[in-house]
């Protein structure tokens, strides 16, 4: 059997790792052993932070919705409750965007949520609001 020399594949692998480590500080960018460890760790951080990013954006959307809804005299929790009771299914990302870029449409949603809350308060039931916007 012929002898296999690994110089070409080893060089290619090292080149791949060092390319991923480009921009790192100190020996991490040009020493293969430290670069490999740094790249592996960077992948772990990237995986973790993709999840953290989703949490952060959801929190940001909720803060924006809360700030916009308080101008209409409601809290975030009451507003979401009113939307659910009115049968309006809009996610928080869209609500946040509407609050910033389309305040009139957002105001209509707030009024629909208020109407649903008042209707159910008067009726004393937990059924869905008949005048729901679907």
From Swiss-Prot:
Gene Ontology, cellular component aspect: ribonucleoprotein complex; ribosome
The highest taxon in the source lineage is: Bacteria
Q: Which Gene3D superfamilies match?
A: 6.10.160.10, Ribosomal protein L20
GO terms in the biological process aspect are: ribosomal large subunit assembly; translation
- Spell out the InterPro entries in the cross-references: Ribosomal_bL20, RIBOSOMAL_L20_CS, Ribosomal_protein_bL20_C
Q: Which GO terms describe its molecular function?
A: rRNA binding; structural constituent of ribosome
Which Pfam families would you find in this protein's record? Ribosomal_L20 (PF00453)
Q: Does the keyword RNA-binding apply?
A: yes
UniProt keywords (A-Z) are:
Ribonucleoprotein, Ribosomal protein, RNA-binding, rRNA-binding
The record's function comment reads: Binds directly to 23S ribosomal RNA and is necessary for the in vitro assembly process of the 50S ribosomal subunit. It is not involved in the protein synthesizing functions of that subunit.
The Swiss-Prot or TrEMBL record describes its family as follows: Belongs to the bacterial ribosomal protein bL20 family.
NCBIfam families for this protein:
rplT_bact
HAMAP family found in the cross-reference section: Ribosomal_bL20 (MF_00382)
Task: Please give the name of this protein.
Answer: Large ribosomal subunit protein bL20
Source species of the chain? Rhizobium leguminosarum bv. trifolii (strain WSM2304)
């Amino acid at each position: 059997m012929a002898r296999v020399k690994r110089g070409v594949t080893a060089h290619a692998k090292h080149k791949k790792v060092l390319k991923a480590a480009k921009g790192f500080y100190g020996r991490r960018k040009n020493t293969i052993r430290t670069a490999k460890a740094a790249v592996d760790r960077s992948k772990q951080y990237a995986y973790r932070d993709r999840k953290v990013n989703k949490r952060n954006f959801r929190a940001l959307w909720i803060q924006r919705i809360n700030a916009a809804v308080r101008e209409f005299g409601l809290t975030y929790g009451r507003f979401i409750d009113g939307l659910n009771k009115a049968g309006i299914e809009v996610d928080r990302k869209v609500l946040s965007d509407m609050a910033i870029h389309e305040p009139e449409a957002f105001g209509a949603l707030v009024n629909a949520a208020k109407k649903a809350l008042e209707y159910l308060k008067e009726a004393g039931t937990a059924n869905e609001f008949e005048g729901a916007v679907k």
